[in-house]
Amino acid sequence: MDYLAHLVVQPLIQVDRRVFTILDPNLNRGLPPFLTEKEDVGLMIAQYTISSLLNRISLLVYPSTIFTTPTSASQEDHVSNSYNAALKSLEIMDLAMDIAAIEYLVSSYALLKRPWFDKTSSMVKRFVKELEPVFNKMFEEKTLGELFASSKKILDRLSDELLKSLEKKKDLL
C-alpha cells in the first residue's frame, strides 16, 4: 500500500503544473487570467485547492512500514502496519480523484475558450459537453466546492462508462 501511495504523487504534481499553466496568462497562450473575463479571481481557487490537497497527500505518503512492531512471536513485523497503510492509500486515492475532477473542470472550461474547440475529437467534445450544466453556474451563486463536487460526480460516471466499454472490448478479443 505504501508503494501505491508513492506511485500516485508524481502524476498529481503534473496535474498541478498543468492547471497552473492554464490559469497563468503568461503561460496559457491567450486565455484570460484565471479563465475569467472579469476583474475577478476566476478559477484561481482551483489551483489553491489542488495545492492544498497535494500538501495533505505529502503528509500521507510517509510510509507506514517505516516503523515495525514485531508480532506473532517475532514471525510477523509489517502486518501490523498494513491497516494504516491501507487507510492512508484510500484517502490518497480519494484526494487524487478530487484533484482529477478539478483538472477536468479547469481544462474543459479552458478548451471551450479556444477557437479550435470545434475541431477536437468527438470524445473530447463529449467529455467537455458533460460539464456544460456546471459551466452555466460557474461564476454565479454556486461555490467552487459545489462545482468541484459536480465535476467529480460526472468524472466518476464517465470513468465507469469507459471501464464498462473497455471490459466489453476485452471480451471480444
Residue ranges and their predicted role:
Residues 1-173:
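C-terminal auxiliary extensions adjacent to catalytic cores
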